Structures are given as structure tokens and as C-alpha cells.
């Protein structure tokens, strides 16, 4: 047993962990990877390479960009600016300070640059170094990521969402027969680089191949082939095989027999063996590929064909006169009847022709002959004219342009991924470092395109996850950085060329503003940098794991079709098929699956267990969609014996293309890790997900993200076992940084003495300051509560404090309530919800919302604005909540219209006489006219002031309130310092005591004598400071004491220095925006109780609005008198098909009844009626092996565990591997309940039983962020639109109700002419009529007159703008 100071016993915190009865059957081999590592790895590891030494940094991220941009040289090569290394300074403010001061959390980037200046000898041209200057240059502040994977930009927390985009590489498609009326498939290829010009190749309806660059005008593909330097002969030789026709005297031509090119058909002429002259098949007989192969095997090498057969074939080389060697026909020309006669006349023996047949079409040859360009120069000029129309084309410019397009690494980058994809698709073996196009690439793209047209190979599936990759934060910011540095490079070159380089230093050349503005713009305005969804911890995690197909370089909503949005077989285990928004973004915004991760190339990987010879091993392998296609993968629930050997004759496996096959166990390569790897985090929190309809599951996972954190949190009785992981990874709860023992705890902070000692042997101290009532991005309340007590022993990563929506380290988005499914007087019509008054009374669904209000005192033209209590024309009563400075007290209750901060603004006044001016100058009197510009509580807001923050500009004197707040903060910092010092001192002096006791004194303070032996009593008589004055005989001990003293002094100094720095920061004043003298922020917390109109939901997509709050005595109740909390409509189930909620209700019913049973057992044990063994037996029956760790503890601890589950037993039913119907029935039986889960219910109003049994049970319900208080509003007096003079609309404008077109029709249908008239005139935009009506109401009359509505005048004006003059003319009758 370990004892703390003051003899408090140390207890392990793990004893407090919640134990759930788990229904899962599959043992988890792999842990869920950290849920936010996708963000952190991408930015900190891959982009910034933060805590890595300069020499060990890899060439990626920031390092690779700086390497690629530098060195920068001027045009004459006299000056050269090189990059040496970069590093980050510590940020000026920490995360919390940035949030409070509306600043960005960023660190200064310092880059070391070397400027070399050369001397060039004008005569010889030789270069000599003239001078080298190296300097560290500040390149702006780069935003840092917080520990939770977010960024603080201008004080708000933002998330950069990962983007799914098409992977770089080459892709082959066809148009699905949509372009041409005949439905013919037109094939095309597209080369997509990471950056640079796109290259498209396509067939047209006439089977000619064209290419386009960047979707400009199309040109013949052979122009491109000629531009890369291929001649006609090379083109034909590369794409076609050649065959020789040999003349056989008087018989025809002998040609090689090629059985591979034969398709089944009837012969038009005899099949004759050229060598023997035998006729093998007669004309009219059928030949098949199999028969052709048979003849070939039997020795048929050459066949005889008629002379005319050559007509229509294409020459595979120039046809020359055998005598004069004159060219008769060019390569590729078609043999005509005339040409055949010439061949006969000249007795040419051998003719070489191209092999063109249905398996190898004449497309390239036809394109060659359609193309007018015959050489490289004309081809290049042609391309130049298309890309630069209007510019004169010369060969140098054309060559330069073409090279820059695809072959210049500065302008074209396929990226490593693109090169890998290109190599695998074109079957090439080019080094991965070559990230530009090569001549081989272009030749082979055309080859594969032609092969596709010939029916070989298949087109690419664009939605396959092997063809889509993820760009995470690091990569997105890397691209912005590159843009910024390229712009900066231009300005560096300009500055080098402009001035005298000899006198310049590196910092004179670099303008960091260009870079900073690009990065700033990305974080503040990019579509992918989003305001973090901070409603609850789950919504934060989901936001960080989101994958968006939208954004720059991605798709747009309007153009995205069904295919892109649809679920694809490769999504399995990578992207969740359930969680996606409803509406126009459906399928374009997805969520990563629970176990998925992103590899270095940006492809999503999913984990699998390796299977060797039919035995499942514990080796976990991550596979991307491309790799997965090569294997046979079994499902996680395949039957396995205790040794891991797959059972059964055949196993159902997934193979490429999303197909399923049955294979023998030894053929299986991998099996899924767990069935849960298919879905996302939010979906994995839904118990019985497998029993819900997919549409409802989608709503369920989306609505969990809208659940508001409640005052009292309560983890679900029926969970899935993932709750703890979500709470831990979300960053909402506080994790212990090291192993240690809790020294102090209160509601604001936890102090832990760590057990991991430092190098000097002294303990370090961890102080955790908890967040209290902070406002989240969505105005919900962030509040942390400690879970530990003094003396608890905590391990690293234990949860020591709960955050919002967490309960004992598990995520708790709602509450467990007793639900009955029955109709109740029509109050639960159309998904309405009926709730008991108890829920409101006991604050079961009460939440706290915090709003922030800000007022700025500025320096105006007429003088400074002032924050003051002295406000003109305001009663003392209205100022009762304000302090002497004019700022509201913390704790004040406020309602709409109350003053929060008093402020006056000078207003211009009448000119003053010189005498008055003189008096004012003498007496310094400020008799300025001022107007009230105070901050009031807006309409619809009421609550308690929980915090006030005051920021004053540097140099502006602070007011009393600001000084008081500052003092409070300094006291808090001093307490942290003193506590840490106290723990260190306690350790140091107890160590000294151990060393000194038993030693002989040589010298020391007055109280001790030389030669005396030190005892504990002697030391007690000395003060702590006097310990250091003692000198003892043992020299070794003296050395050790000296070392301890040095360490102690260093530690003390470090703590004081840190304290002083923080205090200085507090006292120094703030950086405020231009013109602002002082900023005051007031935070108001409002308690929202549940009320009619609030939206609630379960986890299965079952949502509804509260219709009525019923007194407890009128609600239905159970036979034991328990009143039902909520009544739901049973008709909301059958059509919605989310049966999971019924199973959850049944299991919840078992949960509370089992808890009652355990409580009864405990009571009997305490009354000495039963032994502890009976309780143990029951717990084993209920929990199985999970409970062993509890049963090993003492009897008191077992009883304390039983008391913890007295409200309800917690279950875990993992997704797709959870409780079956039989398990639920077994639990109900164990709880001594009817296995149907239904009970007799009594009507609270009549006291009679309902006719039928009713399903009753505990269900987990959430209160959603759609609160009626934020939506309902009414208008009495308010603003009008300037043009139409009609009241504005909407709550934010304090607007009225729109009486629209259809509402007018309704009144017309009733014939309510007068009602209609007043609606369209005095109640809307008849200005004079409005005033007259008001007058008549004031006078007590009830008549009014309608005039012409303003909108009629607007219409007349619009007519006039069309030059139509409309006048109202009254003619006499």
C-alpha cells in the first residue's frame, strides 16, 4: 500500500472505470487508430516537420517547397540566393490567450538564407565568388495546430477539411454512347497532372484520333506524335505489325497463317495450304478460331490467297521500283487496283502490308493520312497557333512552349502518385522521381487508347478509390505555400535586378507579406477551411474526419451526377456508406470509416487480418483499394475455431469489382478486422444499427452531431462500446500526461505529482487548469469536471476530468429516460413527443448556452468614446447592475434591453465662442455633447453574466475593473507557481533529510554544535533554509547536497521566470485593431429547459417535436407506481423501419430491472440474509468474464461497484456484432421480466389499465440544437424596407410575418374583401394609411382609410424605367 503525504491511501483510478456487458463475439485484434491523427500527421509530421532536427528532415512538405523554389538567381547570374534551413520560434501567445484576444495561434517562421555574389570577368566570362552573406530571415507567422487538430484563426477555432479529388495519372473512358446519335462508344484518354496542363486524347465518330491541350481546339493525335519527334515510319512501326505477301507464280499470294486473328465466319474463297497446294476448306464452309488453331498445330504455316486480296490493304513500307529504286507509293498508302496492276507489271515479288483487322483497326494510319503536318516543325507550329492564337509562330517559340507544357518540372508535375499510377496503367518502368511526361508515356497512352477501341482491356472506373485520393491539411497548405513563394520569387528577382546587390542583405530581398497574405487568405476564406462544428465532442471529431469532394480543384454541386455521389464497393472499410448530409451535398461530403487511415500517397487504407493456410493470424495489414483488388477477403464474422482455423467447406469472400465468391478456406488471403470497420464514428455509436433502415441510420448519425451538451450527463445504458474511444480522442475530456498521484483537486484545477522522475531525480508536477463555462463555436457550454480524488493513482492517458457531453470518460450526448410507446389523446400525432413534468422539474434535458457580446470604444474624429457609468438620460435603476466604471457585474441577472456596458460617443455640437474655448482650455472641462451608445442585451436574450473580459490598447490607462480582473489572473498564476514549488520543495527536503540523518556536523547554524550527529529531532529544530548551512564530514554527501542545491535553485528560478513572463504579458496591454482604445466582452449564460417546440431525437433517426408537458399525475404509470417520462407514437415505427429503437428499448428495460435486482441483492447482503458469493454468482451470470477484475477486489469494493450500477446496468452491443433477439430475451428473463418486453400500464387520468400490453423501457434520447427559443419571435414595432416600405422579414431583422401570394388567394377564396384590403395596405406598405390608423387608435376610434400602397408606386417607377409613362386619370361619370 502506497501512502501519500498526510497518510492518504493511494487508490488506482482504473477502479472507477465503467464496465459494460459486451455482446460482441469477435475479439478485437487492432485498436481503433487515433481518430484525429489524419489531421495531426498531415500537418505536423508531413508539412511542418516541427520537432525534427534540420539535418534529419525529409524532403517533403515545407522543406521540399523551399528546396524547389531556391536557389533564386538574377537574370545576369551575378547574385544567387540559396536556402539553408528553417526553424520556428515559440508562439507569442498560447492557444487559450489567442482565443480570448481574437488572435491567430501561429509561430514565426525563420528561414536561413545565403546570398552569394559573383564577379564575372567580361573578357573571359569566368566567375569568381565576390562575397557570401548568410542571414536568418523572418518569413511571417505560420498557423500552428492545437493538440486537438484545429487551428485558431482570429480567435475562432477552425478545421481544414480533407478533400477527395481525382488522383493524378492517366485515365481512359468512353462517353457511354451519349455524344453520337448512333450510340457508338467514343473512347478518350485524359492525363491529369498534379499541376500543369491537361492532355486529352479522343476518338471522333469517324474513328480519327484527336488531342487537346487544356480543352482548347482539337488537333490530330499524329501532330502530337510528330511533335515529340516521331516520323511517319516510326509511328507506323510502333503501332502496327507487318506481314509479307509473297508472289506464287500463277497462283496468287502466299501469306503467313495467323490463327489468332481469325473470328468465326463463312469463307468467301477456298482455304489452301500454300506449301502443299491442298484445299483444306471449301468456300462457303465455316471456320472457327478453334479449327484455325487445329490447322496451325497440324503444320499449316502459309495460306494461298487471290491476287485481288491485296486491294484495300495498307503498305507497311515504301513501295519501290526494283530496277530504278524509285518510290512508287509511300508507307501507309492503301493498295488500289491500279497499284496492284503496277505491282504485277513490275513483277514485284514481296509486298509488306500492315496487319489491320477487327482486332487491330486502321485508326492511327487513317489519322496520319488525315493530318496535313508532315514533319516536327509544322506540328509544333500548329500546336503553338492553337495555344497562342494571334501570335506569330516560329519554331523556337513553338519548341519552347511545347517543352514548357509537359516536360519542364517547374511548370508540370505529375507527382510521385501520378507517376506510380501512370506506370501501372501503361505497364512502364520509369523511375518514380521522373514527375514530368516522357515520350514513352505519350506513345503508350495512344497505344492503350487504340487497344481499348479494339476491344482489349477495360476503361477506368473514376469512382474507384484507387483513382481518387485525399488531400489533407498539410498538402492543401503546401499548395498555398508554393503559390506564395512563387509570387515572392518574382519580387526577389526584381529587387536583385533593381539595386546595387553588393550592399543588400538577404532580408532586403525577401518580402514576407506576399507569403503571409496567401496563407491568411486560405485559412480565412477557403471553402475547405471551415468554422468548426463544436456543438458536442462527436460533431468535432466528425468534422475533422470529413472528406469533401467540393472545394477548389474538386467538383461543384450542380455538375456532380449520381455516380460520384453513390456508394462504391471500394468504400468498404474506407468511407462510411451511411454518414453523409441530406440535401444537395449528399454523397459529396463523406466521413472516413472508423478504422481507416490515409497512406503517404493519399489513398485510404483499411485494416485486415492475414490468413495463412486457412488459419486467421493476429497480423494486421493495411490495404489500399488498389492492393485489395489482388486478394480474396473474407468477412469478420466467418466461423473460426478456438485456434483461429476457418470452419466450413466454403468461405464467402470479396474479390475485385465488389463481387462475392465462395472459396475454400486455404484460398482466403485476408479477413476483416471487425464488422465495425465499415461505418464511421457517428454510425458506430448507434446500437442495433443492423436493425435500422439505411435512410434512418443516416439521419441518426447526423442528428447525434446536433445534440446539445446537457447540465447532467448520463452515458447510455445501451451503448456500442465505442463511447470511451470517442470521448478520449475528441479532446473534450482531460487526459493525464504522465503516470502520477493526485495531490490536489478542486473544480478549477487538478495537480498531479508525476512518478516519472527527471534526470536529476526530482519529480515534475503536472497542473491541469480546467475549462469552466466557456463558450463553444455554437454557443454551447464547455465545462470540465474532475473525475479524480486526492490520492488517486493515474496512468498516462487516463481520463482525469469529464468535458461537455462526457460521463466518466464515455461520450454522453443525451439522457436515459423511461419511454412508453402508445398514442395519447392525439398529442403524439405526426411524431410529436409527450413529456412528463418531472423532466423539466429535475432538469433532465436542461442545457446551458453562452452568448458573447462585445463593445469597442474607438477614437473618433470628435474625440475618444468613453466607457462610463455616466450616461445621459438614463435612470439610476437602469444602471443598478453596472460597477463604477460602467461595466456589468459578474453574476448579474439580465433580460432583453438591459445595459451591459455603458458607453458614450462625442457628437458634433454648435460652434463655441473664443471666451468659452479659453475657459475650457484653462479648466480642462469637457462639456462636449455626448450621445448614448451603450451595449444593450438584444431581444430574446436573458440569463446570467458569467464572465467579463477587458482589453485595453497599449499605453491606454487601465480602469479599476480591468486592474481587478488582472489581479485575479495574477493570483491564479501565483497559486500554480507556489503549488508546483511546494511539491518540489517537499521532495528536495525529504531527500536532504535522508542524506543528513546520521552524519557528523563540522559546521552549521547557531542551534547545532560541531561534532554532533544529526537526528530527525535536530533537523526539526532548524528552518528549511538552514538545512543548506550544515556542513558534514562525508565529502560525497556534501557533493550530492551541492548538486541538489543547484537543481533546486535552477527549478525555483525557472518557475519565477515563467511566472514573470506571464505576468508581463498580462500587464503589457493588448494589440487591438486600428482605432480601438478598449474592448469589453460580456458573456451571458442562459439555461434552456425543455419546452414545447424543442426538437428531440433518438439515435435511430427517430425525431420529433415536443407537443405538451403533462403533469406527472396524468402520465401513464407502471404497476409499481413508476411514472413514464416520455410517450412516443408507435405509428412512427412500421413505415420508418428503424426497429433498432425497439430492441434498444427492450434492452434498456432489462437494464433497469437488472439494476433493481442487484440493489435487492445488496440490501439482502447488508441485512446479512445472503453471502457475498451469491452476488458474485449473479454478476458472473450477467457480465461473464468482463467482471473478473471487479470480483478480485475486496467485499466493500464489490458492494460499491453494485451501488454504481443501481440506476441501470450498462450494455455494449457493437455494430453488426451485437445482441441478437435471443440475447435480449435472455436478459429480460434474467431480470425476471416478460420476454416480450411489454407490461401492463395504467392511465394516469382514469387510474384504469390500458386495454393492451404496452412496450416500455429505457431509451436514450437527445435534445437537438434546434431550440424553440432561438426560432420563435414576434414583432410589434420594427424597421421597414426603404424601397417598398414593407416590414422586413426574419428574426434577425426583427421582421414581421409575410402575407404572401397564396395567403391572398385564401382570403380571396373566402371573399374577405376588407380583411384582404387592410392586409395589403395599412398593415403593410400604405405609409399614410399606417399613420392615420395609428392616430385613430390613439383617439379611441376604430375606423381607417386605405390609400395607395407604396409597392404600387414602385411598380409605376419600374414602368417609367422602361420608358412607359403610366398615369392615373379619373374621368367623370
UniProtKB/Swiss-Prot annotation:
It comes from Rickettsia canadensis (strain McKiel). Pfam families: RNA_pol_Rpb2_1, RNA_pol_Rpb2_2, RNA_pol_Rpb2_3, RNA_pol_Rpb2_45, RNA_pol_Rpb2_6, RNA_pol_Rpb2_7. The lineage of its organism: Bacteria, Pseudomonadati, Pseudomonadota, Alphaproteobacteria, Rickettsiales. One of its GO terms (cellular component) is DNA-directed RNA polymerase complex. Belongs to the RNA polymerase beta chain family. It catalyses: RNA(n) + a ribonucleoside 5'-triphosphate = RNA(n+1) + diphosphate. Signal peptide: none annotated. It comes from the Bacteria. DNA-dependent RNA polymerase catalyzes the transcription of DNA into RNA using the four ribonucleoside triphosphates as substrates. InterPro entries: DNA-dir_RNA_pol_bsu_ext_1_sf (IPR042107), DNA-dir_RNA_pol_bsu_external_1 (IPR019462), DNA-dir_RNA_pol_su2 (IPR015712), DNA-dir_RNAP_su2_dom (IPR007120), DNA-dir_RNAP_su2_hyb_sf (IPR037033), RNA_pol_bsu_bac (IPR010243), RNA_pol_bsu_CS (IPR007121), RNA_pol_bsu_protrusion (IPR007644). HAMAP family: RNApol_bact_RpoB (MF_01321). Keywords: DNA-directed RNA polymerase, Nucleotidyltransferase, Transcription, Transferase. The gene is rpoB. GO terms for biological process: DNA-templated transcription. This is DNA-directed RNA polymerase subunit beta.
Amino acid at each position: 500500500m502506497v501512502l501519500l503525504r498526510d497518510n492518504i491511501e493511494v487508490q488506482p483510478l482504473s477502479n472507477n472505470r465503467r464496465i459494460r456487458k459486451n455482446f460482441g463475439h469477435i475479439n478485437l485484434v487492432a485498436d481503433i487508430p487515433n481518430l484525429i491523427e489524419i489531421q495531426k500527421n498531415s500537418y505536423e509530421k508531413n508539412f511542418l516537420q516541427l520537432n525534427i532536427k534540420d539535418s534529419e528532415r525529409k524532403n517533403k512538405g515545407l522543406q521540399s517547397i523551399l528546396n524547389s523554389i531556391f536557389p533564386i538567381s538574377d537574370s545576369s547570374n551575378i547574385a544567387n540566393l540559396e536556402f539553408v534551413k528553417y526553424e520556428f520560434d515559440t508562439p507569442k501567445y498560447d492557444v487559450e490567450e489567442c482565443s480570448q484576444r481574437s488572435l491567430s495561434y501561429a509561430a514565426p517562421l525563420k528561414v536561413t538564407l545565403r546570398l552569394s555574389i559573383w564577379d564575372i570577368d567580361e573578357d573571359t566570362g569566368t566567375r569568381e565568388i565576390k562575397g557570401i552573406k548568410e542571414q536568418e530571415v523572418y518569413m511571417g507567422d505560420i498557423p500552428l495546430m492545437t493538440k486537438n487538430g484545429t487551428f485558431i484563426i482570429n480567435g475562432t477555432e477552425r478545421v481544414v477539411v480533407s478533400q477527395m479529388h481525382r488522383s493524378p495519372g492517366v485515365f481512359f473512358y468512353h462517353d457511354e454512347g451519349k455524344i453520337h446519335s448512333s450510340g457508338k462508344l467514343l473512347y478518350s484518354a485524359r492525363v491529369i497532372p498534379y499541376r500543369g496542363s491537361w492532355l486529352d486524347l479522343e476518338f471522333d465518330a469517324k474513328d480519327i484520333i484527336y488531342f487537346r491541350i487544356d480543352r482548347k481546339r482539337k488537333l490530330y493525335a499524329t501532330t502530337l506524335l510528330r511533335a515529340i519527334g516521331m516520323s511517319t515510319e516510326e509511328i507506323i512501326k510502333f503501332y502496327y505489325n507487318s506481314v509479307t505477301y509473297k508472289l506464287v507464280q500463277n497462283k496468287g499470294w502466299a501469306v503467313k497463317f495467323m490463327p489468332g486473328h481469325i473470328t468465326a465466319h463463312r469463307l468467301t474463297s477456298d482455304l489452301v495450304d500454300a506449301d502443299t497446294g491442298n484445299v483444306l476448306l471449301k468456300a462457303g464452309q465455316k471456320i472457327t478460331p478453334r479449327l484455325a488453331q487445329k490447322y496451325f498445330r497440324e503444320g499449316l504455316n502459309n495460306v494461298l490467297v487471290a491476287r485481288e486480296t491485296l486491294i484495300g490493304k495498307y503498305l507497311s513500307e515504301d513501295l519501290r521500283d526494283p530496277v530504278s529504286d524509285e518510290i512508287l507509293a509511300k508507307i501507309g498508302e492503301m493498295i488500289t487496283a491500279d497499284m496492284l496492276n503496277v505491282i504485277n507489271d513490275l513483277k514485284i515479288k514481296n509486298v509488306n502490308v500492315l496487319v489491320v483487322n477487327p482486332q487491330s483497326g486502321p485508326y492511327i494510319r487513317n489519322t496520319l493520312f488525315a493530318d496535313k503536318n508532315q514533319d516536327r516543325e509544322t506540328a509544333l507550329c500548329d500546336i503553338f497557333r492553337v495555344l497562342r492564337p494571334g501570335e506569330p509562330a516560329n519554331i523556337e517559340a513553338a519548341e519552347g512552349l511545347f517543352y514548357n507544357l509537359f516536360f519542364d518540372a517547374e511548370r508540370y508535375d505529375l507527382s510521385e502518385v501520378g507517376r506510380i499510377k501512370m506506370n501501372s496503367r501503361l505497364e512502364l518502368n520509369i523511375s518514380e522521381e521522373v514527375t514530368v511526361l516522357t515520350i514513352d508515356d505519350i506513345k503508350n497512352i495512344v497505344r492503350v487508347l487504340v487497344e481499348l477501341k479494339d476491344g482489349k482491356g477495360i476503361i477506368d472506373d473514376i469512382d474507384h478509390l484507387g483513382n481518387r485520393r485525399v488531400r489533407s491539411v498539410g498538402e492543401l497548405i503546401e499548395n498555398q505555400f508554393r503559390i506564395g513563394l512563387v509570387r515572392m520569387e518574382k519580387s526577389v528577382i526584381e529587387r536583385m535586378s533593381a539595386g546595387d546587390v553588393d550592399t543588400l542583405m538577404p532580408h532586403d530581398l525577401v518580402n514576407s507579406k506576399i507569403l503571409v497574405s496567401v496563407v491568411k487568405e486560405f485559412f480565412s476564406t477557403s471553402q475547405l477551411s471551415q468554422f468548426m462544428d463544436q456543438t458536442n465532442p462527436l460533431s468535432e471529431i466528425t468534422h475533422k474526419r470529413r472528406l469533401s469532394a467540393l472545394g477548389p480543384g474538386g467538383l461543384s454541386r450542380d455538375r456532380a451526377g449520381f455516380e460520384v455521389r453513390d456508394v462504391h464497393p471500394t468504400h468498404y472499410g474506407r468511407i462510411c456508406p451511411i454518414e453523409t448530409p441530406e440535401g444537395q451535398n449528399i454523397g459529396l461530403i463523406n466521413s472516413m470509416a472508423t478504422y481507416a487511415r490515409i497512406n503517404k500517397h493519399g489513398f485510404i487504407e483499411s485494416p485486415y487480418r492475414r490468413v495463412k493456410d486457412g488459419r486467421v493470424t493476429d497480423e494486421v495489414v493495411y490495404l489500399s483499394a488498389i492492393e485489395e483488388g489482388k486478394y480474396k477477403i473474407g468477412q469478420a464474422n466467418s466461423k473460426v475455431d478456438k485456434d483461429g482455423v476457418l470452419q466450413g467447406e466454403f468461405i464467402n469472400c470479396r474479390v475485385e469489382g465488389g463481387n462475392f465468391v465462395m472459396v475454400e478456406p486455404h484460398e482466403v488471403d485476408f479477413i476483416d478486422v471487425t464488422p465495425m470497420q465499415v461505418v464511421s464514428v457517428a454510425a458506430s455509436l448507434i446500437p442495433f444499427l443492423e436493425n435500422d433502415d439505411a435512410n434512418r441510420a443516416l439521419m441518426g448519425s447526423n442528428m447525434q452531431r446536433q445534440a446539445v451538451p446537457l447540465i447532467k450527463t448520463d452515458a447510455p445504458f445501451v451503448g456500442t462500446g465505442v463511447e470511451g474511444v470517442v470521448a478520449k480522442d475528441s479532446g473534450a475530456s482531460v487526459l493525464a500526461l504522465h503516470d502520477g498521484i493526485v495531490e490536489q483537486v478542486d473544480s478549477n484545477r487538478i495537480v498531479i505529482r508525476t512518478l516519472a522522475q527527471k534526470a536529476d531525480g526530482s519529480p515534475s508536477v503536472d497542473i491541469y487548469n480546467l475549462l469552466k463555462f466557456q463558450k463553444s463555436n455554437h454557443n454551447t457550454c464547455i465545462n470540465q469536471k474532475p473525475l479524480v480524488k486526492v490520492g488517486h493513482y493515474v496512468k498516462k492517458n487516463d481520463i482525469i476530468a469529464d468535458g461537455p457531453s462526457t460521463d466518466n470518460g464515455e461520450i454522453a450526448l443525451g439522457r436515459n429516460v423511461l419511454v412508453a410507446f402508445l398514442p395519447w389523446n392525439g398529442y403524439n400525432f405526426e411524431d410529436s413527443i409527450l413529456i412528463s413534468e418531472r423532466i423539466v422539474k429535475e432538469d433532465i434535458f436542461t442545457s446551458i448556452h453562452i452568448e458573447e457580446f462585445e463593445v469597442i470604444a474607438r477614437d473618433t474624429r470628435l474625440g475618444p468614446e468613453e466607457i462610463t457609468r455616466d450616461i445621459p438620460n438614463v435612470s439610476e435603476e437602469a444602471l443598478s447592475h453596472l460597477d463604477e466604471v460602467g461595466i456589468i457585474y459578474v453574476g448579474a441577472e439580465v433580460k432583453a434591453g438591459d445595459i451591459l456596458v455603458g458607453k458614450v460617443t462625442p457628437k458634433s455640437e454648435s460652434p463655441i465662442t473664443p471666451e468659452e474655448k479659453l475657459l475650457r482650455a484653462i479648466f480642462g472641462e469637457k462639456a462636449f455633447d455626448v450621445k448614448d451608445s451603450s451595449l444593450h442585451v438584444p431581444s430574446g436574450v436573458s440569463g446570467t453574466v458569467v464572465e467579463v473580459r477587458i482589453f485595453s490598447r497599449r499605453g491606454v490607462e487601465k480602469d479599476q475593473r480591468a486592474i481587478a480582473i488582472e489581479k485575479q489572473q495574477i493570483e491564479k498564476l501565483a497559486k500554480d507557481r507556489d503549488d508546483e514549488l511546494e511539491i518540489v520543495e517537499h521532495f528536495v527536503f525529504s531527500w536532504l533529510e535522508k542524506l543528513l540523518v546520521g552524519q557528523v556536523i563540522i559546521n552549521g547554524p547557531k542551534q547545532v554544535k560541531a561534532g554532533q550527529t544529526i537526528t530527525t529531532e535536530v533537523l526539526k529544530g532548524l528552518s528549511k533554509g538552514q538545512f543548506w548551512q550544515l556542513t558534514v564530514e562525508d565529502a560525497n554527501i556534501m557533493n550530492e547536497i551541492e548538486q541538489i542545491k543547484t537543481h533546486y535553485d535552477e527549478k525555483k528560478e525557472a518557475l519565477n521566470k515563467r511566472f514573470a513572463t506571464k505576468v508581463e504579458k498580462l500587464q503589457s496591454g493588448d494589440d487591438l485593431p486600428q482605432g480601438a482604445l478598449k474592448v469589453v466582452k460580456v458573456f451571458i449564460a442562459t439555461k434552456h429547459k425543455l419546452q414545447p417546440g424543442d426538437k428531440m431525437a433518438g439515435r435511430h433517426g427517430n425525431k420529433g417535436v415536443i407537443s405538451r408537458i403533462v403533469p406527472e399525475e396524468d402520465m401513464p404509470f407502471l404497476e409499481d407506481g413508476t411514472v413514464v417520462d416520455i410517450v412516443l407514437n408507435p405509428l412512427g415505427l412500421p413505415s420508418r423501419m428503424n426497429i433498432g429503437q425497439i430492441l434498444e428499448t427492450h434492452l434498456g428495460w432489462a437494464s433497469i430491472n437488472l439494476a433493481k435486482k442487484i440493489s435487492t441483492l445488496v440490501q439482502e447482503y447488508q441485512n446479512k440474509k445472503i453471502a457475498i458469493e451469491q452476488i458474485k454468482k449473479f454478476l458472473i451470470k450477467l457480465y461473464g468474464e468482463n467482471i473478473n477484475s471487479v470480483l478480485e477486489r475486496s467485499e466493500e469494493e464489490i458492494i460499491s461497484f453494485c451501488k454504481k450500477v443501481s440506476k441501470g446496468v450498462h450494455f455494449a452491443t457493437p455494430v453488426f456484432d451485437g445482441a441478437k433477439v435471443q440475447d435480449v430475451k435472455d436478459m429480460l428473463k434474467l431480470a425476471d421480466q416478460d420476454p416480450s418486453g411489454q407490461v401492463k400500464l395504467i392511465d394516469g387520468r382514469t387510474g384504469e389499465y390500458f386495454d393492451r400490453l404496452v412496450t416500455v423501457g429505457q431509451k436514450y434520447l437527445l435534445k437537438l440544437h434546434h431550440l424553440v427559443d432561438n426560432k420563435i419571435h414576434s414583432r410589434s414595432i420594427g424597421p421597414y424596407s426603404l424601397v417598398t416600405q414593407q416590414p422586413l422579414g426574419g428574426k434577425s431583422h426583427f421582421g414581421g410575418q409575410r402575407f404572401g401570394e397564396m395567403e391572398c388567394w385564401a382570403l380571396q377564396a373566402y371573399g374577405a374583401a376588407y380583411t384582404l384590403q387592410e392586409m395589403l395596405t395599412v398593415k403593410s406598405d400604405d405609409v399614410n394609411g399606417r399613420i392615420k390608423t395609428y392616430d385613430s387608435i390613439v383617439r379611441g376610434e376604430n375606423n381607417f382609410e386605405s390609400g395607395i400602397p407604396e409597392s404600387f408606386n414602385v411598380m409605376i417607377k419600374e414602368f417609367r424605367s422602361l420608358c412607359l409613362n403610366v398615369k392615373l386619370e379619373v374621368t367623370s361619370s
